[in-house]
């Protein structure tokens, strides 16, 4: 029997290092098959429900197309369209949905919600994003890193994450490092460093897998020798604008710009961004923040750097489709097919 059959994916560490490597390998094959239009619909007659308490572009599209490509049917439940936790308990919702569907994707505000969904569900539950973790994003990032540097093992690759190192992306990168030995440097002001106990736990596991994790405020030290610089937005919709002001003031010097790329001393440096990005004034929010805070050419990343690295950044986004597809096959099929 497939070892991941019916297994929940709430955080990256729910899977083993071998599981993650297998998913990346399966994603590579599925990506090749899609490009060559010779996929087989292994998920025919499967039904999947997507619960989105938070809006989404990439995650929703990736889950829907991954399902459709593999022959599964999808129900989308958007913000405000369920009674989850309001008129109907999470426990009852999980029991109802798992009696109808073969799998449940959840994207929302509270990680405790998805933990409770998984606790009372009889089918696999996948995390499309919570405030603590974003494992489906990091699966795509790991595939992108592997494709970009196929000659290197993860323990010989350095990734510098720059910005707010307390968020769901940095938390999940910490787990990736702990499992795969990816060398990770979190470059941020101390007030934006991750929970110490969680950091220490991941650091110890990373060392066992021949990797290293450090935190530093020193940009030059943090990015020197990096193969990848990873950043994310500094502000999220729904947060008070006062929070935006304080955070931008503290993170301003951590903007990913040409000077930072030069500090890596790596002419082949690549930049990762999970998107969306405030690299220009072409969004209402981006224009408001840039004008109000007198920012030069973007917020967390400059327009120049974003566009020069867009091939990798948008490949990250595309790879969500292939890794999510590999995740669905790995957790929904009792016997894994030869593909």
UniProtKB/Swiss-Prot annotation:
* An annotated GO BP: citrulline biosynthetic process
Q: Which reaction does it catalyse?
A: carbamoyl phosphate + L-ornithine = L-citrulline + phosphate + H(+)
A GO cellular-component term linked to this record: cytoplasm
Pathway(s) annotated for this protein in UniProt:
Amino-acid biosynthesis; L-arginine biosynthesis; L-arginine from L-ornithine and carbamoyl phosphate: step 1/3
- Subcellular locations according to the entry: Cytoplasm
Family recorded in the similarity comment: Belongs to the aspartate/ornithine carbamoyltransferase superfamily. OTCase family.
Q: Report what the protein is called.
A: Ornithine carbamoyltransferase
């Amino acid at each position: 029997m497939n070892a991941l059959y019916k297994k929940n994916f709430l955080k990256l560490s729910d899977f083993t290092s071998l599981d993650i490597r297998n998913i990346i390998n399966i994603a590579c094959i599925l990506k090749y098959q899609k490009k060559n239009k010779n996929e087989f619909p292994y998920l025919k007659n499967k039904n999947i429900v997507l619960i989105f308490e938070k809006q989404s572009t990439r995650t929703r599209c990736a889950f829907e197309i991954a399902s459709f490509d593999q022959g599964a049917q999808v129900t989308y439940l958007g913000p405000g369209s369920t009674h989850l936790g309001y008129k109907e308990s999470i426990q009852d919702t999980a029991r109802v949905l798992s009696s109808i569907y073969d799998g449940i994707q959840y994207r929302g505000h509270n990680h405790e919600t998805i933990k409770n969904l998984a606790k009372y569900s009889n089918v696999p539950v996948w995390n499309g994003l919570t405030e603590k973790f974003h494992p489906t994003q990091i699966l795509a990032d790991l595939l992108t890193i592997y494709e970009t540097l196929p000659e290197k093992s993860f323990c010989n690759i350095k990734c510098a994450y720059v910005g707010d190192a307390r968020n769901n992306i940095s938390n999940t990168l910490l787990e990736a490092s702990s499992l795969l030995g990816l060398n990770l440097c979190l470059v941020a002001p101390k007030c934006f460093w991750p929970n110490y106990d969680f950091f220490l736990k991941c650091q110890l596991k990373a060392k066992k897998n021949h990797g290293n994790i450090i935190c530093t405020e020193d940009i030059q030290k943090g990015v020197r020798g990096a193969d990848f610089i990873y950043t994310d937005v500094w502000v999220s919709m729904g947060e008070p604008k006062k929070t935006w002001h304080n955070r931008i003031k503290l993170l301003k010097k951590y903007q990913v710009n040409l000077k930072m790329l030069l500090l890596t001393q790596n002419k082949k440096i690549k930049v990762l961004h999970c998107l969306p990005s405030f690299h220009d004034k072409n969004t209402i929010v981006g224009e408001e923040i840039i004008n109000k805070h007198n920012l030069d050419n973007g917020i967390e990343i400059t327009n120049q750097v974003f566009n020069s690295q867009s091939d990798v950044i948008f490949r990250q986004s595309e790879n969500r489709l292939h890794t999510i597809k590999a995740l669905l096959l790995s957790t929904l099929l009792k016997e894994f097919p030869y593909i």
